[in-house]
């Protein structure tokens, strides 16, 4: 009949007292051997286990040769050794002694030929870029070493329009001469030159220079009369133009 190992927490260590175990409560009609086995205290079980270890061939014999009967081997209390627990890791180690290869998805698989071609293309691209950078640096150095072309300075003549020359960016003397000749041909430029070189403006400049304080009043009168005459002339000109336009 199969018997379960007694629960040592429920068994009392004193040999005189007898405690009912779970097996006795479940099936009280057990034989005497099973009752004695279940009611055995824990101290006696430990003594028999020590005697079993001494009787084993690996253990050294006692020096006296006389063994205590309490420590003799008892077949009733022989239990097998502990079973090593099996975990998924140990099972995998037993079933697969060699290391498992890394998992690779089929879409991520790349052929070796493609790898070689990509590497070669990247190397050639890098070499081309390096060559282009070297060429550009050499060209910049050559441009910096070349001296600028000589430019002729424009000599000032009787009249030179600096603003027009800057706007036109006349780098040579011929271009500046052509530009000035084109300005002289235009009617607006001719009218501007006439206004500058008019006799009336020259006379005013001469009169205004070196005037004594005694002649200030007379100078003011003459200036006012001249302004009035000029206003009359301008008014007459405007009236004539308006009549001609009508």
From Swiss-Prot:
For this UniProt record, give its keywords in alphabetical order, as a comma-separated list.
Cytoplasm, Phosphoprotein
Query: Where does this protein have compositionally biased stretches of type Polar residues?
Result: 49-61
Provide the record's note on post-translational modification.
Phosphorylated by CDC28, probably in association with G1 cyclin CLN2.
The processes (GO biological process) annotated in the record are: G1/S transition of mitotic cell cycle; nucleobase-containing compound metabolic process
InterPro entries in the record: Srl3/Whi5
Cellular component (GO) terms are: cytoplasm; nucleus; SBF transcription complex
- Which GO terms label this protein's molecular function in UniProt? RNA polymerase II cis-regulatory region sequence-specific DNA binding; transcription coregulator activity
- Where does this protein reside within or beyond the cell? Cytoplasm
What is this protein's function per UniProt? Weakly suppresses a RAD53 null mutation when overexpressed.
Q: Which PANTHER family match?
A: G1-SPECIFIC TRANSCRIPTIONAL REPRESSOR WHI5-RELATED
- Protein's UniProt name: Protein SRL3
Q: Which organism is it from?
A: Saccharomyces cerevisiae (strain ATCC 204508 / S288c) (Baker's yeast)
Q: Which gene encodes it?
A: SRL3
């Amino acid at each position: 009949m199969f018997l379960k190992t007694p629960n040592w927490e429920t068994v009392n260590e004193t040999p005189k007292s007898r405690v009912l175990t779970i097996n006795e409560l479940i099936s009280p009609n057990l034989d005497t051997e099973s009752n004695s086995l279940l009611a055995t205290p824990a101290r006696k079980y430990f003594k028999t286990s020590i005697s079993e270890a001494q009787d084993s061939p690996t253990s050294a014999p006692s020096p006296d040769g006389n063994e205590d009967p309490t420590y003799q081997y008892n077949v009733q209390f022989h239990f097998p050794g502990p079973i090593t627990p099996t975990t998924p890791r140990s099972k995998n180690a037993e079933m697969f002694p060699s290391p498992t290869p890394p998992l690779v998805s089929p879409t991520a698989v790349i052929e070796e030929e493609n790898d070689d071609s990509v590497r070669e293309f990247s190397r050639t691209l890098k070499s081309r870029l390096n060559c282009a950078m070297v060429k550009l640096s050499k060209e910049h150095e050559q441009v910096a070493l070349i001296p600028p072309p000589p430019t002729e300075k424009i000599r000032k003549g009787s009249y030179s329009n600096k603003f027009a020359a800057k706007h036109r960016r006349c780098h040579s003397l011929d271009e500046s001469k052509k530009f000035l000749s084109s300005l002289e041909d235009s009617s607006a430029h001719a009218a501007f030159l006439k206004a500058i070189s008019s006799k009336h403006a020259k006379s005013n400049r001469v009169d205004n220079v070196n005037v004594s304080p005694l002649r200030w009043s007379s100078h003011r009168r003459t200036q006012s009369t001249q302004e009035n005459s000029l206003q009359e002339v301008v008014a007459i000109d405007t009236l004539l133009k308006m009549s001609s336009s009508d």
